[in-house]
From Swiss-Prot:
GO terms for molecular function: ABC-type D-ribose transporter activity; ATP binding; ATP hydrolysis activity. This is Ribose import ATP-binding protein RbsA 2. It is an enzyme of class 7 (translocase). It is found in: Cell inner membrane. It is a peripheral membrane protein. The complex is composed of an ATP-binding protein (RbsA), two transmembrane proteins (RbsC) and a solute-binding protein (RbsB). GO terms for cellular component: plasma membrane. Belongs to the ABC transporter superfamily. Ribose importer (TC 3.A.1.2.1) family. Part of the ABC transporter complex RbsABC involved in ribose import. Responsible for energy coupling to the transport system. ATP binds at residues 37-44.
Length: 506
């Protein structure tokens, strides 16, 4: 094997936690190598050591057979290591050219920025990737996939020979993900080694050559993709066999009351009018392609965005829900798609995040907060949803994705909501934590909560939902239930609409 990268006996501890213990990893030139493990397994810490962000307590890094010590990120970049983080590091108001050369602008002989040379170099990089990017458009106007390609281009502009891709498909459509895989294969052909981190195990079998699995900061195994399967990988990642991620679906009472009835919702003046109902104890799925109107519908219902026409009832009573505060008073909460930026204040503690929407509940005097009462409630809801953390004072930014999602759920339970909207609830969450979130959702419906679940993952729509409203171009094309909920039927309505359909929207 033509080894370009060798990590040997890497060990790293933080106060009270041994994050990595004696980890070995070898990557070949031109190899796409998957790094798998649950959140908290040590993947991020290992990659931060490779990037010079953390220094190991013990162990060595070799690139092309030469020992390396990275005092900081710039040392790693100089050695040919590049990383594309899950959360982009682009400047939104700058164009692709300026983002690629930010802080290292090319200069002409008079010392002025040489825009022409930088633009030509950027064009050559994107031609190497085989992607079309408007070089003069502000980054904020590009699609998420195009921004991803700019991040990859930035790494290549720094002559990266080892490229780390951290959850690169998390916000991409299937078609965009396929485009990314094509780019990865081209880079592989050019000899670039890639470390691919993903919670989507099916992607591993599409694009990777070998896999290394970590668990609880320890090395488990390295195997060729052709010699393993999903079940074996899951067992290596979680240390046990997961029979099924999805809890059994209950039989809903025929007379289960409707807790939310949308009699008419028209977002645009000339747009379709949608109608649907949500019953107590039910999980209603919103399925469809990206941009089909699922999230837009949910946001319009709670008043986060305006609608041309909106007629709805909450537990039988007409409600306006002019804004999210109205929705909250009516007992409706939302777990947004971007939990880190829209659902949490990550620099706050668990306690402060859970109390955020309900501080009045703990007011002991006009301006004072009953911290003891707040702590008791926080401990209670953390226990109910299964948040795993050292204390209620733990900063949310340090939690895994699954535990962060549970903190958002705990906040809404603390506010006595009865309707919860889960928008992409398992995005960026590992396989074990997904099963916990699914189980928690079913526990909530068993206690009388009603849930709208928006998801781009077809297996969880099929496995979790009692009924499914399928969206296409802003319209609910059909509402499926029971045996009608299968992948083929959902995709037929999502892509082809009601041509030849037998189901009516609910």
């Amino acid at each position: 094997m033509d080894t370009i990268l060798r990590l040997s006996h890497i060990t790293k501890s933080f106060p009270g936690v041994k994050a990595l213990s004696d980890i070995d990893l070898e990557i070949a030139r031109g190899e796409i190598h998957a790094l798998l493990g649950e959140n908290g397994a040590g993947k991020s810490t290992l990659m931060k050591i490779l990037c010079g962000i953390h220094q190991p307590d013990a162990g060595t890094i070799e690139i092309d057979g030469a020992a390396r010590h990275f005092a900081d990120y710039h040392d790693a970049v100089a050695a040919g290591v590049g990383i594309v983080f899950q959360e982009f590091s682009l400047i939104p108001h700058l164009d692709a050219v300026d983002n690629l050369f930010l802080g290292r602008e090319l200069r002409n002989r008079w010392g002025a920025r040489d825009r022409k040379r930088m633009r030509a170099a950027a064009a050559a990089i994107f031609a190497r990737l085989g992607v079309a990017i408007d070089l003069d458009a502000p980054i904020r106007t590009l699609s998420v996939a195009q921004q991803q390609f700019v991040e990859i281009g930035k790494a290549l502009s720094l002559d990266a020979r080892i490229l780390i891709l951290d959850e690169p498909t998390a916000t991409l459509t299937p078609a965009e993900a396929e485009h990314l895989f094509a780019i990865m294969r081209e880079l592989k052909r050019q000899g670039v080694a890639m470390i691919f981190i993903s919670h989507h195990l099916d992607e591993i079998f599409v694009v990777c050559d070998r896999i290394t699995v970590l668990r609880d900061g320890q090395y488990v195994a390295t195997t060729e993709v052709a010699r393993t399967d999903v079940e074996q990988l899951v067992r290596m990642m979680v240390g046990r066999r997961i029979e099924s991620s999805f809890p059994p679906k209950p039989v809903l009472p025929a007379d289960a009351p409707a807790v939310l009835e949308v009699d008419a919702l028209q977002i645009e003046r000339d747009g379709p009018v949608n109608r649907f109902a949500l019953r107590e104890g039910e999980i209603l799925g919103f399925a469809g392609l990206v941009g089909s109107g699922r999230t837009e519908t949910a946001l319009a219902v709670i008043g986060a965005t305006r609608a041309h026409r909106k007629e709805l009832r909450v537990r039988g009573a007409a409600a306006k829900l002019a804004d999210p505060a109205d929705a909250l008073r009516a007992g409706i909460g939302i777990l947004p798609e971007s939990r880190k930026t829209e659902g949490l204040v990550t620099s706050f503690s668990i306690r402060d995040n859970i109390s955020l929407n309900n501080l009045g509940k703990y007011r002991s005097m006009r301006w004072l907060i009953d911290r003891r009462g707040e702590a008791r409630t926080t401990h209670d809801v953390m226990r109910r949803v299964g948040v795993k953390a050292p204390s209620i004072h733990t900063e949310v930014a340090t939690l895994s994705g699954g535990n962060q999602q549970k903190v958002v759920i705990a906040r809404w339970l603390n506010h006595h909501t009865s309707v919860l909207i889960f928008d992409e609830p398992t995005r960026g969450i590992d396989v074990g934590a997904k099963a916990e979130i699914y189980g928690l959702m079913r526990e909530l419906t068993a206690r009388g909560y009603a849930i709208i679940m928006i998801s781009s993952e077809l297996p969880e729509i099929v496995g979790m939902c009692d009924r499914v409203a399928v969206f296409r171009q802003g319209r609910i094309e059909a509402t499926l239930e029971g045996d009608e909920i299968d992948p083929d039927t959902v995709m037929t309505y999502a892509t082809a609409g009601t041509r030849g359909a037998t189901h009516e929207p609910a």
